[in-house]
Structures are given as C-alpha cells and as structure tokens.
C-alpha cells in the first residue's frame, strides 16, 4: 500500500497543465463499443479508472493501442459479459452495458464498485434501457440485459437528474430505431462532450446541454478522431490548493466556461481571477480566504465533486459557513479526517457547519474516497508539520500525476510504499 508524506506550510505558486476529463473519458471509452471502425481518442488522462476501462475493452475483444492517443477498434468484440474481477473497483463500468445492448442485443455487467458515496443505485440506468425495449434481469450480482432485434425509441422522463443514467440512455439510443427523447436530462459538460463525440461518429443528437435531449437513431456509427475536454474538477482542485496556501497559480489547457460557479465562489473568497480561452489565473498572495456558502446541485450549479475541496477552504477561512450537500447523502467522509488535522466542523443532516481556524496541523489520515483524498492532500500542503495520507488507490483513480504537479508549484510531497 502506498502513502503520501507531505511536509506542509507551503505557498503553492506556478503553472499547472490540466489533464483530460476523467468523467468524460470513461463514457467515451465505453461508447467506442458502438462503432465497428477504428477510433482515436486524444487527451485521455493516465489514471487507474481509464486503465481499467481499457482493460475491460480488451477483455471484450476490442483492439486497443496506447500512445499519446488511445486507438480503439471494437469491430471484433465477441464477449458481452463484464466479470466481477474487472469491474468491482470501477462504478463507471455500467456505461458498457448500453453500448453492448445497442450493438449486439445483449450484455451483462457485474454490479459495479468505485467510491462508496452513499447510495448510488443503477435503477435509473436500467429504467431507461427498459423503456428502449430491453429485458433486464438481476441475478447473482449481475445486471443482464437483452433485446430481440434493435432497441426502439422512447420518451423517457427521469424522475431525478442523473449524469450516469443520462449517459447510458443517450449512448444506447444512438443505434435505436426512431427518435428517443430524454426529459429532465443532466446538463454536465461531460455529457455534452460525450454527445459531441458520438455526433463526430455520425450520431444524431440535439438538445444536449439542456434538460431535454433528442436522439434520432442511426444504423451504424463510423470511426473518427476526438479530443477529450479538460478536467474541470482537477482544475478546481488546483485553484483551491493555491487559494488556501495564499499562493498564485495559472492552470493551462483548461476550459473556464465549465467552471463558472467555482470561479464565482473563489472570487467571493477573496481571490483575484483572470481567464483566457484555455487558461485560468488565480492570485491569493498573502490573503486569507473568506468563508463562502456552498450548496451542491446539478450543473450548472456547484459540483458535488468540489465540495470536499471547498470544505478545506472554509475550515481555514475567516468566519463560519455552511456547506449543503444535495447530491449524495454520505459525502462527508473527509470531515472526520480534517478534524484530526485541527479543523472545526459539525455535520447536521446534509449540512456541514464550518468554523474557520488559523492553522491546520499535520496528522495521519485516510483517503476514504476520491475527493476526500484530494481534500486531504491539499490540506496537508498547508498544514503545520507532517501529514501522511493512506489509501492512495482512490487518488490514483482520478488524478493524473497529482504529486508531480503539486511539486512543480512548491509542494513538499513524496509517495512512499508502506
């Protein structure tokens, strides 16, 4: 098992180059199953989750070559079953089911794993596939789906906004007969990116980025070349890291348009923000942040994936604040670890009451999920003393070379084997 050892009290200053989006790469990689032709995917982040996705594609029978780009040819897929040993660590594997079903008429996926953040059921994914004509069976820990002939169009009204289910239904509907309508669809940039990828292969999709998406099914998709959008959560994480360290940072190869609410909250905290077409500059030199009120909600609201990082900001800010988590009911696993570091916070229902302190202190902490890991690492960078962060598996799932990027802006961080 690996751990980070971080010597804190460092001002983080410099340049960071942002990787491709984890949350767009995964559905796009699995959507390559829909095509029989070679596809080149650019800007795929080198992280554990994309490694697992590529491993699963190869298991199914796809040819995958890895260089600066990922080259995938799913023509010869002959296995439609994703076993437990391949998908148990990655919840995103459910996104393979829709493409398998749409192209081959069948598919089965072991109920997936990943971060244990509350109750993340796949019910909405399966509801959508049933509406498209699939028969669904749950047996021995597996989701099994089949359809006679092709999937057919449907009007699908989501009773809850779901990024994952929107992606599943949209991908499957690209090869369905007729026009499928998804109402109350999620609007996240990663959904837009996945739709743009599918459109580049010949899919007919309209309304993406709104709450109603229209998909006119086609018989087949072609090959192509596509570049993944930048990771907005990685960008936000480094911006917060600089802000809490009273530093100055420029993030390159990013997209400011996907971070409007995050940049607004950083500005409220006292940061000076400048933006360009593909860069963001934050200046918090020698300024202590002000506490900001946070309430997570679906895009374009404040992203739940930035909640833990802003918790750290509020814990070292002037004043007190409330963070309300509206997406996941158990996304507070960072709180007990931050309290070990001297943070003052109380959880009541879905709220975190944060009380700013002058200084966090080094401690031995455990990264219990991906964004907890990120929050503890950036907290360690500013804490007085030595912080050790255990269970790096989670951070490696979602952040590409995070320790090297932090070192480049002044962090004293080492990866050690226990």
Swiss-Prot record:
Which cysteines pair up through disulfides? They are none
For the modification 2-(S-cysteinyl)pyruvic acid O-phosphothioketal, the affected residues are: 115
Q: What GO terms are given for molecular function?
A: UDP-N-acetylglucosamine 1-carboxyvinyltransferase activity
Provide the protein's localization. Answer: Cytoplasm
What does the record give as EC number?
Answer: 2.5.1.7
Active site as annotated = 115
- What keywords were assigned to this record? Cell cycle, Cell division, Cell shape, Cell wall biogenesis/degradation, Cytoplasm, Peptidoglycan synthesis, Pyruvate, Transferase
* Top-rank taxon: Bacteria
Q: Which residues bind phosphoenolpyruvate?
A: 22-23
InterPro entries from the xrefs?
Answer: Enolpyruvate_Tfrase_dom (IPR001986), Enolpyruvate_Tfrase_sf (IPR036968), MurA_subfamily (IPR050068), RNA3'P_cycl/enolpyr_Trfase_a/b (IPR013792), UDP_GlcNAc_COvinyl_MurA (IPR005750)
Name its pathway.
Cell wall biogenesis; peptidoglycan biosynthesis
Where, in this chain's numbering, is UDP-N-acetyl-alpha-D-glucosamine bound?
Answer: 91, 120-124, 305, 327
Q: Which GO terms describe its cellular component?
A: cytoplasm
Grouped into one coarse class, the protein's main location is cytoplasm
**Reaction catalysed?**
phosphoenolpyruvate + UDP-N-acetyl-alpha-D-glucosamine = UDP-N-acetyl-3-O-(1-carboxyvinyl)-alpha-D-glucosamine + phosphate
GO biological process terms, semicolon-separated: cell division; cell wall organization; peptidoglycan biosynthetic process; regulation of cell shape; UDP-N-acetylgalactosamine biosynthetic process
Q: Give the function comment from the record.
A: Cell wall formation. Adds enolpyruvyl to UDP-N-acetylglucosamine.
The UniProt entry's sequence similarity note says: Belongs to the EPSP synthase family. MurA subfamily.
NCBIfam families hit by this protein: murA, PRK09369.1
What name does UniProt use for this protein?
A: UDP-N-acetylglucosamine 1-carboxyvinyltransferase
Source organism of this protein record? Wigglesworthia glossinidia brevipalpis
What are the top taxonomic ranks of the organism?
Bacteria, Pseudomonadati, Pseudomonadota, Gammaproteobacteria, Enterobacterales
